């Protein structure tokens, strides 16, 4: 009977977890939560990194330069959540990292509900009320938001009831030293595992576990029992510390330079909105953490009833202990201040924030902490009344469970989004193993990184950290919690190359080229990946970066164009650069299909983004006074043909190759695409390497200026293709 009861409870919370996350579960293999960039990428990367560090000689789990390269970051305060790594490591090879993470979500939520139910039952709360209270604890907005954000550290709220349950076992068996010793050892291991999930659980557990431990000391029958309780408590703490030293982050915590941190200001600490957030649930997936309309109203109703109609009918003094534990988390949960009648009132969290030097910055998480004691208070109060009538007990328990489920809005689908687009070229990078391939870094563009306290650039480019699991190389982009500001802040404006590649500083060609020449070989950099979709194809920035890189053929060469990504291999790379010869469309004829996928291999400055006009892929020129194209050809002479059309008024066009003019200038009309032919002598082609073709036109027109559209671009010539035909 006892086993069946536990099995039913466990299945109940498992089903509830699945219902609460049904929408992401339906898309578990392809999507993650949210409709804006969340933290999913670095939680997945964390587990890849742990496996990589454990299986690669010379690496340390708690130190890395694989993100925010070239700096080495102490990961002692990073959210590694190592407790969950074994489950991920078991599942990831079988089902992939996305599905494995969803299994962690379900496991964490189920354990949270089940352990809360165990605690309520041990505190003599009726089964039905315990199910309702534990469900309220499991289905808080903070828990569901944690699923959406992949914050598996915040999701592991089962540690709070687990620690109380374990201490209760020590107290219950205190007269049997061997049993108590075993439970103390288990508690020490549990404290260690809790710390390997998230350090803040030690802070949270102190608000519940210390008062509960004091209660058991008071309730102990003899001073010898109290002495043993203290001894076993010390033993558990010592065991935790020993394990953290030899198999955890403690040595790295002690060497961590806290002066390098950049904590957020108090005003940014996310508290529960006062007063609405204590009596309603709203904007959960917009990062608003609330208590909802069940927990606090039911607790207040129970308190009022206890002081009035139930004052003489319920004589259970222990329930007041649990109610008292609600007070401190409740006061801390709104954050640094609240607004009452237009007056700002400073709250106690301000002192706590300052005491911890801003290390704890999410006071709204105290909301989950107060639910456990609140539900025990409610359950112990009403249980005395309900146990007298089986029908009333069933009806009340059912209504409370239904109220929790309705309040949790289970059937509202959680926002989801596809994970960052997969690319085959990252897998090819990942196949490059051994010396010297293991040494290079991948530079993602736009450049962006952060620490959870400060950021350089937008969040979306940081998502490229997810690709690190595929290519397995060092990279700049990404996020490491509480990384020193010095590791990445210079990317903002101070560094000409990285600030320009992050779209925060204008291009300074000489400075950027100098830095590229030094860093490609010193860091070294193996590949530079330009994410055109993130930069934006509309506007000059994308063409500026691609065009500039194409002017440095001795340093960079395009090797992959896939989807919205253009990948440049550097001169350091052992595999070298392939020839930049356009596709041969027929024997002896090579064509650059302007506007088609892959033309990024050839285009320089002056081109606008690709377009499809009447089924033809084209680009407009005109952004610069001249427009360049870069390519290689087999040695020899060629006839160059260009398909072009002018915008708004005829244009005079001259063509140059390697700055040498070809033939006479031609006039390009506005009527339709026309073909213009030029002769390219063999002596200009030379060995065929690093050729530059320039379109030199006599002006441009902005469509908006001539009332043709709202287009603000400078348009000169529309080009469909450029062909090179053998011409002896």
Describe the predicted segments one by one.
Residues 1-24, 233-234, 314-325, 395-397:
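Start-transfer (signal-anchor) and selected internal transmembrane alpha helices
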Residues 13-16, 104-123, 128-218, 232, ...:
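Membrane-embedded helix bundles of polyisoprenyl
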Residues 34-53, 232-309, 361-368:
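Periplasmic/ER-lumenal interhelical loops and adjacent helix-loop junctions
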Residues 16-112, 140-145, 151-157, 271-275, ...:
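Membrane-interface coil-to-helix junctions
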Residues 210, 233-238, 376, 380-409:
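Signature aromatic-anchored transmembrane alpha helix within multi-pass, membrane-resident enzymes
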Residues 402-589:
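Extracytoplasmic
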Residues 33-36, 146-154, 264-267, 272, ...:
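Membrane-helix boundary/interfacial segments in multi-pass membrane proteins
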Residues 294-320, 324-333, 383-384:
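Hydrophobic, aromatic-rich transmembrane alpha-helices
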